[in-house]
C-alpha cells in the first residue's frame, strides 16, 4: 500500500474495511510513507501488526497501544512511563521517543532511511502583515465571549478555534436560510440534526461491517424503521425518524461574511509580485485572492488534477491544500516559491504540503515557503505542526521537512 498514511486512522471507514480485508484473507501486507505516524503511535501500530505480526515493534493488544500512546505521544501532560521504563534501559536512550525509534528501526522488516531524495534546501519564513484594528477587536471579543460578530453563540472549543482561524483571515462562515423558514422550524431542525449526528458518531466508534460510515448507518436505520427488505444488517436508531421527518423542510447555504479582506489583498499582492503558489484552506479566502490577483483558482472536483498540471509556471496560481496539497506531482517543475495563507496545524499535513515543491524534479537549489502567523491561532498552528514533526522524526527516524528546513522565524 503506497501512501500508507491514508490508512493510519482506524476510525475511518476506509481503514476499517481495509483492516477487515487483511484479517479475513490472511494477506501479506507491505506499506510505506514519509508521514506514517502523524502525531501518535496509534497511527502506525495497527499497520505494523498486520505487516510484521509478532515481530511488530508495537504492542498487538489495542489497550496496551493506548497506554503507550498516553505516555509517548506529544503532550503537555503525558502519562507516566510505567513498564516503558524498561525500554529506556534496554536501548540505553535517555528519552522515550529515541528509545522507541531504536526499537522500531532495529525490528526485522522495518526499513528506515535518513537520506533525502532531493538536494534542494528549504527556507521557511513569516510573511509579516499588519492586522487591522477591526479584526483585532473582533477576535478579542470572540475569545472572551464565544460569540461571533453576527451574534451566534459557539458551543465548543473546536468551533471557537475554527471561527477564530476564519476571522484571522478576515471573514467567517455562517449559515443562511434563503427560503425564509420560521425560526421555530429552523431550531427544531437544528435539534434533530444534532441528535442524529451525535448518535451516528457514537455508533461509528464500534466500526461494525456494513455499519462503518454515516451513509451506511442511514441505510441500516431505514431498513429497520421503514421495513426495507435486505440481507444487510439493520440499526434501531432512536433519532432517525425524527431527523428524516424534518430533514428536508429546511434549506440552508453557507455564506462568507467579510470583516476585512486585508489578508486576501496581501496574498494577492504577493502573487502578483512573485511567481508561485498561494495555498489556502478556506474556499472563500482562496476565491477572494484569485479574484483580486486575477489568477486561476485550483480547487477540487472533476478534472482538477488535469487543470492544475496544465499550468506552465508563467503566472502565480491559487491552490487548495485539501485538493492538491497531498500526492500531487508535477508542480515542482514550474514553481519553487509558495505562500501558505491558511497554515495547517498538523505536522503530516505540512510534510505533504512542502513535498509538493520540495521533491525530485525541482530544478532550483532552494524552495522558499512563506506563511502567515499574525494571530495566536495562526502561530499556534505552525508551532504545533513543528512540534509534531520533531516527534515524528524522533520516533520514526524519517527526516521531516519542517525539521530540516531553515525556519527563519525560529532563529533567536
Spell out what each predicted region is.
Residues 2-3:
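Walker B catalytic acidic pair
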Residues 8-34, 39, 53-203, 273:
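Inter-lobe coupling linker of SF2 helicases/translocases
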Residues 43-61, 335-340:
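A short helix-turn-beta junction within AAA+ P-loop NTPase domains corresponding to the substrate/partner-engaging
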Residues 29, 276, 367-369:
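Hydrophobic/aromatic residues located in beta-strands of well-ordered beta-sheets
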Residues 25, 292-293, 334-335:
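Short, structured coil segments at secondary-structure junctions
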Residues 118-135, 143-329, 400-412:
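Conserved Helicase C-terminal RecA-like lobe
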Residues 33-44, 280-288, 303-311, 315-365:
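SF2 helicase motor core recognition
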Residues 345-412:
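A conserved SF2-helicase RecA2
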Amino acid at each position: 500500500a503506497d501512501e500508507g498514511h491514508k490508512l493510519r486512522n482506524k476510525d475511518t471507514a476506509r481503514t476499517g474495511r481495509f483492516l477487515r480485508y487483511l484479517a479475513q484473507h490472511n494477506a501479506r501486507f507491505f506499506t510505506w510513507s514519509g508521514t506514517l505516524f502523524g502525531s501518535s503511535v496509534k497511527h502506525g501500530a495497527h499497520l505494523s501488526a498486520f505487516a510484521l505480526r509478532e515481530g511488530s515493534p508495537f504492542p498487538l493488544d489495542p489497550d496496551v497501544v493506548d497506554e503507550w500512546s498516553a505516555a509517548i505521544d506529544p503532550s503537555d501532560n503525558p502519562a507516566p512511563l510505567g513498564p516503558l521504563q524498561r525500554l529506556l534501559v534496554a536501548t540505553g536512550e535517555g528519552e522515550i521517543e529515541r528509545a522507541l525509534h531504536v526499537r522500531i528501526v532495529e525490528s526485522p522488516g522495518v526499513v528506515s532511511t535518513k537520506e533525502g531524495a532531493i538536494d534542494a534546501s528549504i527556507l521557511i519564513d513569516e510573511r509579516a502583515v499588519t492586522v487591522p484594528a477591526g479584526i483585532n477587536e473582533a477576535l478579542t471579543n470572540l475569545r472572551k465571549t464565544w460569540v461571533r460578530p453576527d451574534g451566534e453563540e459557539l458551543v465548543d472549543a473546536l468551533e471557537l478555534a475554527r471561527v477564530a482561524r476564519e476571522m484571522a483571515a478576515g471573514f467567517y462562515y455562517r449559515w443562511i436560510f434563503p427560503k425564509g423558514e420560521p425560526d421555530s422550524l429552523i431550531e427544531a431542525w437544528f435539534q434533530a440534526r444534532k441528535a442524529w449526528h451525535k448518535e451516528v458518531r457514537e455508533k461509528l466508534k464500534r466500526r461494525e461491517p456494513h455499519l462503518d460510515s454515516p451513509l451506511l448507518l442511514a441505510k441500516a436505520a431505514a431498513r429497520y424503521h421503514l421495513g426495507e427488505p435486505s440481507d444487510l444488517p439493520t440499526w434501531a436508531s432512536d433519532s432517525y425518524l425524527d431527523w428524516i421527518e424534518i430533514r428536508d423542510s429546511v434549506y440552508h447555504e453557507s455564506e462568507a461574511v467579510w470583516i476585512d479582506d486585508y489578508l486576501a489583498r496581501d496574498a494577492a499582492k504577493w502573487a502578483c509580485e512573485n511567481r508561485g503558489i498561494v495555498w489556502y484552506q478556506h474556499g472563500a479566502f482562496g476565491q477572494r485572492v484569485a479574484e483580486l490577483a486575477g489568477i486561476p483558482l485550483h480547487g477540487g472536483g472533476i478534472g482538477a488534477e488535469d487543470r492544475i498540471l496544465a499550468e506552465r509556471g508563467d503566472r502565480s496560481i491559487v491552490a487548495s491544500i485539501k485538493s492538491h496539497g497531498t500526492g500531487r506531482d508535477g508542480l515542482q517543475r514550474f514553481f519553487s516559491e509558495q505562500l501558505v495563507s491558511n497554515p495547517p496545524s498538523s505536522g503530516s499535513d505540512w510534510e505533504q504540503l512542502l513535498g509538493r515543491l520540495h521533491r525530485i524534479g525541482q530544478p532550483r537549489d532552494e524552495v522558499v515557503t512563506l506563511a502567515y502567523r499574525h494571530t495566536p491561532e495562526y502561530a499556534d498552528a505552525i508551532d504545533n505542526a513543528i512540534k509534531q514533526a520533531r516527534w515524528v522524526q524522533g520516533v520514526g527516524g524519517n527526516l521531516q521537512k519542517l525539521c530540516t528546513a531553515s525556519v527563519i522565524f525560529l532563529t533567536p
